[in-house]
Amino acid sequence: YKSDNVPKNTVDLTDSQWAVIKQGMRQMVSDHTSPSALINQINVNVAGKTGTAEEDTTRPDHALFVSFAPYENPEVSVTCVIPHGYTSGNAEELAGMVYAYMYDPDKLDTLDITGNNQMSD
């Protein structure tokens, strides 16, 4: 596959600036996601950023999660977007399943899929 798309512009960041961004993404997963969450139970360190996007006040927010792994030497990026997915935790949970499939498939055997249908703020 060859794409003819060309970036419109780029952002020049120093290596230390990139390191801070990547460290923040790792800390978001390791420090701000439950230790019992699948994404923190698999045999790979994931770095990521959650987010939501509001379409209007009468429908649930869209759930977003962008990520990469392994944190120490990235091989893959997983991005999950769930239209009207309520909260970014749902997109993060889905990404955790993808990483488990890739790096620790035995974790999927006992997975309890419940979802989190809480409304975002």
Residue ranges of each PLM-predicted region?
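Active-site beta-strand/loop architecture of penicillin-binding DD-peptidases
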Residues: 1-16, 22-109
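Short, highly charged C-terminal tails/helix-capping segments
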Residues: 109-121
